[in-house]
Amino acid sequence: MALSMDNIVISNEEEIYMMKAMHIPCGLYLNMVLRAAIELDLFEIIAKSTTQKLSSYEIASQIPTKNPNASSLVLERILRFLASQSFLTCNITKNDDGNVHTSYNLTPLSQSLILDKDGTSIAPFLLLATDPVAVNSWFHFKDAILEGEIPFNKAHGVHAFEYHGKDSRFNGVFNKAMQNVTCIDMKRVLECYNGFEGVKEIIDVGGGLGISLASIISKYPNIKGINFDLPHVIKDAPTYEGIEHVGGDMFKSVPQRELILLKAILHDWDDECCVKILKNCWRALPKDGKVVVIEQMQPEYPEINLISKNSFSVDMLMMTMLDGGKERTKQQFEDLAKQAGFTVFKIVARAYYCWVIELYK
C-alpha cells in the first residue's frame, strides 16, 4: 500500500511551528528550481504539447540534453518537487500491462510562468530576482544596519541605476522583467479603473520604455501619449503609434498635460525627492487635471495576508537596491501629496498588489 501524508494530522502546535521553521531554508530551493525550469523551458514544453500532460522522458526528449534517458531520471525528481509546490499536477496511472505511467501538467500557478496571449509572463521577473547581480546584494543586507550602506552599492560599487549602464546583460534582464510586470499590472488596471476615459493627452513621468502608455492607448486609441524619461532611457524605447518619447528630468520640470501618470516611481525615492517630483507635477497640471499614482501600499499594521506580505517583501527589495526607496502607507502617500500642494487624495482602485490613487489641486 502506498504511503500518503495527506491523512497525517499534526495537532501539537509546538511541532507545527518547529516543522514550519525547519522548512524556511527551503524557500531558496524553490526559487532556484523554478529558475532552472524556466531556463529549460519545462513549463512551455508542457503547455505546447497536444495533451498538455507529459512524462519526464517526453519532456527530456525536447531538451537539448546529451543523455535523455539519464536526464529524465533527474527531471522526474524536479517535476515531483514542483508538483509538491503546486506548480504542477502529477498523474499516476497503470497501463493494461501493469506498468506505472507518470505524467505532469500545468496548474494555474505555473500558467503565470508561460507566455499568455499578450506574450507576457511572470517568468522574467523571477529570472531578475534570482539573477546573480541581484542575489549578491542580499549578502550585504546587514550592512544597511551596521554601516548605513545600500547593499547593492556595497556589492557592486555603484548605484543600481548607474550599474545598468555598465552591464548590458543585466540591463536587458531588468528591462524584460519590468516590461512583463508592467504589462500584467496595466492590463489589470485597465480592467478595474476607468479614469482614462475621455482623456485627450497623458504624460507618463518616468515611463521608461513606454509600456504603460502603450497599454493605455491600446484601449483608448484617441489618447495622445508623452513618454517622459531621461534621454538615455528613451533612446532605447520602441516606436508606438500615438506615443511621443520626450527626454527630460522629472526633478527639474514636467511637461504640462491634463493627466500625469506616475507608475511605480515614488517607491524609488525618499520623501524629499518624492515631494519634489509631485510639486513639479502640481505645477504642470491644469486646474481640472489629475495625477494618477499607481503604487503598492503598506497597511499600518504588518498583516499576514497576500497583499501585505508582498508590500513588505518589496520594501525589503527597495532597501537592498536604492537609497531612500521604500513602500509607503496610505497616510504617508497622503502626507507627500499635501506637502506638494494637492488638496484631494483618492484611492480609487486596486489591481493585484497595486493601488490606483488620484490627486487633484
Curated annotation (Swiss-Prot):
Q: In which pathway does it act?
A: Flavonoid metabolism
Family listed: Belongs to the class I-like SAM-binding methyltransferase superfamily. Cation-independent O-methyltransferase family.
Q: Enzyme group, top EC level? A: transferase
Among CDD domains, the record links this protein to:
AdoMet_MTases (cd02440)
Q: What is its EC number?
A: 2.1.1.-, 2.1.1.76
List the PANTHER family.
O-METHYLTRANSFERASE (PTHR11746)
**What Pfam families does the record point to?**
Dimerisation, Methyltransf_2
List the top taxonomic levels of the source.
Answer: Eukaryota, Viridiplantae, Streptophyta, Embryophyta, Tracheophyta
User: What InterPro entries is this protein classified in?
Assistant: COMT-like, O_MeTrfase_dom, Plant_O-MeTrfase_dimerisation, SAM-dependent_MTases_sf, WH-like_DNA-bd_sf, WH_DNA-bd_sf
Protein name as it appears in the record: Myricetin 3-O-methyltransferase 3
Q: Which residues bind S-adenosyl-L-methionine?
A: 229
Subunit-structure text: Homodimer.
Q: Which GO terms describe its molecular function?
A: 3',4',5'-trimethylmyricetin 3-O-methyltransferase activity; kaempferol 3-O-methyltransferase activity; O-methyltransferase activity; protein dimerization activity; quercetin 3-O-methyltransferase activity; S-adenosylmethionine-dependent methyltransferase activity
Query: Which Gene Ontology BP terms does the record give?
Result: biosynthetic process; flavonoid biosynthetic process; methylation
Would the keyword Metal-binding turn up in this protein's UniProt record? no
Write the record's keywords in alphabetical order, separated by commas. Answer: Methyltransferase, S-adenosyl-L-methionine, Transferase
Task: Provide the active-site residues from the annotation.
Answer: 267 (proton acceptor)
